[in-house]
Regions:
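Structural motif
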Residues: 13-17, 41-45, 384-385
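Short active-site neighborhood of thiol/selenol oxidoreductases, capturing the structured segment around
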Residues: 4-28
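Non-transmembrane, aqueous-exposed alpha-helical and coiled segments at domain scale
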Residues: 128-405
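Iron-sulfur (Fe-S) cluster-binding modules
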Residues: 104-137, 144
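Thiol-based oxidoreductase modules, predominantly thioredoxin-like and allied folds used
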Residues: 35-59
Length: 405
């Protein structure tokens, strides 16, 4: 949509529902007697304020393009360009912006404003689609009115066997607010079909997986990590082994988005853990074509192929983090990906010294696949706090634990 022409002079945006807006009507009337022309836009009631011949911003286009978050807002426009503004009612600020003195002498010097309708949570997604500068380029799929949208997505093969969230334009635009990258930016080439995926397509699948916008950078990072020759997601799919991407997240951002790094860390119940991993798996399936029975040749598979993503307990760990061991700062948000099976439990309730406990870990790790196999297999050891405490009390650091095992 074309940006509305900004009239020179003073522009005031109000709504009747706001008590502060009603309070400052006499002040706006004062402004009309000054040297600058005054244009009043009202968001809700087209007759408010009646004495000022307001323009009804019925579709909120003016409020959206003027980036109005609070009403009343007063803007000063010169040659079509905003030079200053103030929000709410602060007498000194109104006088500074308007260049007039003795405004509202009978009013208190300050009163906060109200939220603009253009940032109303019930309206903002629709307004973002209607007026936002970003135009989504993905193909639209129309669902018949009588068709169940959830069943329609199952029928089209877009799911991992669980219901997915319909990726409406409003939801996708909201998801895109989680990143500063452009929707048209290419994130990766997704195997096995080697299809370019843009930030927009990542956002669509993140919506379907149930992600929040703040999870989107983690989905993008995880996708970049699996879609390269080092990880080789094509090979992970094509093997008959029951493996899939295991995504370990590090950094302060894991706590900011509420990832689980504690009890039940591999289990259900945490939205960030489950949906970040799920979004990546949906992308491999929906964009890359990695579907079971086709390129995905796993004989048994494992439940982690829906999602296997978790955060390291950096605050509770006695050691440096996984990301630090790979050369990154503790303050850096990072993902590490590993082609892994489902978790298995190492039980030792008797060991009280690190040597005995190390023997237990080594004995369990030797059983990977087949204890008599001459092939070596990699593994991630996620140590519980009780076992970690045994090593920490003995003064063993992370490097020694790994070396001894």
């Amino acid at each position: 949509m074309t940006l509305p022409t900004r009239p020179d002079g003073l522009v005031v945006i109000v709504k009747r529902e706001c008590e502060t807006c009603r309070m400052v009507v006499p002040v706006i009337e004062q402004l009309t007697n000054g040297p600058l022309p005054v244009t009043v836009y009202v968001q809700d009631d087209s007759a408010f304020p009646e004495s000022l011949a307001p323009i009804h911003d019925a579709d909120l286009s003016i409020s959206w393009h003027y980036d109005i978050e609070t009403v009343p807002t007063v803007l000063r426009i010169e040659n079509g360009v905003e030079v200053t503004r103030t929000v709410g009612w602060v007498r000194d600020e109104w006088q500074r912006v308007t260049g007039q003195t003795d405004l509202g002498p009978n009013l208190s010097a300050f009163r906060p404003g109200c939220g603009s309708l253009s940032v109303d949570p019930d309206l903002v997604d629709e307004l973002r689609v209607r007026f936002g500068a970003t135009t989504l380029s993905a193909r639209r799929v129309d669902i018949a009115e009588a068709e169940d949208e959830f069943e329609a997505m199952f029928d089209r093969g877009w799911t991992d066997g669980l219901p997915v969230v319909p990726p409406t334009e409003q939801r996708v635009m909201r998801m895109l607010t989680g990143t500063t990258r452009q929707p048209t930016d290419v994130v990766a080439i997704v195997p096995p079909d080697l299809v370019e995926i843009t930030v927009e397509k990542v956002a669509i699948n993140a919506v379907m997986a149930g992600c929040k916008p703040e999870y989107l950078p983690w989905v993008i990072a995880g996708l970049e990590a699996v879609c390269n020759d080092t990880f080789n997601i094509h090979g992970v799919l094509a093997t008959t082994m029951p493996v899939g991407p295991v995504i370990v997240c590090n950094g302060p951002g894991t706590r900011a988005i509420g990832m689980n790094s504690g009890m039940n860390v591999f289990g259900q119940g945490n939205r960030a853990n489950l949906t970040i991993g799920r979004a990546i798996q949906l992308i491999i399936r929906n964009i890359g074509g990695g579907r079971p029975g086709e390129v995905d040749r796993a004989t048994h598979g494992n439940p982690g192929k829906i999602s296997f993503c978790f955060a390291e307990d950096e605050l509770g760990s006695p050691w440096s983090t996984l990301a630090e061991s790979r050369g990154l700062s503790r303050t850096t948000d990072a993902v590490t990906v590993f082609p892994g099976e489902g978790p298995r439990c190492v039980v030792d309730q008797l060991a009280r010294d690190p040597e005995s406990l190390t023997n237990t870990f080594a004995a369990c790790l030797r059983t990977m696949h087949n204890p008599k196999s001459v092939l070596a297999f990699d593994a991630i050891v996620v140590m519980g706090p009780e076992h970690a405490r045994v090593y920490a009390e003995a003064g063993w650091d992370r490097e020694r634990v790994l070396e001894e095992i």
